[in-house]
């Protein structure tokens, strides 16, 4: 039923398409926003900030005019630590679909996300991700879509993170 209302800028090769006016019961969509559908049988991968990660674009950036981005990140077994960094954005939300990833905010604040776990990181929060030797698949949402990444020096000087302590976050 929706095929007559599909936005003309359909990405035929990617399975991503937007619906201009779904004409549902009330049709009070926020101006400038569109319904977007990303078909799993035709994923659209784009370049991203890490060479060892495949970024599946879900079409949200275009549908929200850059106000939000949603991507599925696939990091295989040949991945590495990100180094200390921060993101220039309002927030970054992670939902672990498969595998696991370990993220540290300090030597005492180390979190391991496994399938079904989620985390919201406010923009500007310094952190480091360990490599995920078993691989990981994550849904990442950022507001806004344009999320700058800046490398920063180790805020703890010569202190190295012991990622084996993941999950033992010390509350202060």
Predicted segments — roles?
Residues 44-85, 90, 169-172:
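A short glycine-rich, His/Asp/Glu-containing loop-to-beta-strand
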Residues 4, 118, 124-125, 130:
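Short, surface-exposed secondary-structure boundary micro-motifs
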Residues 80-82, 99-104, 118-119:
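Short beta-strand segments in beta-sandwich/barrel cores
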Residues 107-124:
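Short acidic-glycine-tyrosine-enriched beta hairpin
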Residues 72-76, 86-103, 141-144:
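Short, conserved beta-strand element in jelly-roll/cupin
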Residues 2-41, 46, 130-172:
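Double-stranded beta-helix
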């Amino acid at each position: 039923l929706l095929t007559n209302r599909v936005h003309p800028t359909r990405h035929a090769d990617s399975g991503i398409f937007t619906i201009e006016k779904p004409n549902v019961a009330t049709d009070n969509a926020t101006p400038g926003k569109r319904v977007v559908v990303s078909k799993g049988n035709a994923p659209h991968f784009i370049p991203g900030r890490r060479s060892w990660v495949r970024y599946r674009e879900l079409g949200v950036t275009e549908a929200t005019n850059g106000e939000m981005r949603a991507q599925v990140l696939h990091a295989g077994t040949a991945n590495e630590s990100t180094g200390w960094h921060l993101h220039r954005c309002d927030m970054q939300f992670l939902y672990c679909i498969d595998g696991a990833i370990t993220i540290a905010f300090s030597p005492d604040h180390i979190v391991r996300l496994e399938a079904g776990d989620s985390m919201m990181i406010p923009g500007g929060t310094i952190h480091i991700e360990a490599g995920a030797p078993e691989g990981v698949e994550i849904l990442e949402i950022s507001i806004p879509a344009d999320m700058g990444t800046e490398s920063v020096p180790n805020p703890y000087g010569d202190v190295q993170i012991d990622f084996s302590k993941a999950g033992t976050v010390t509350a202060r």
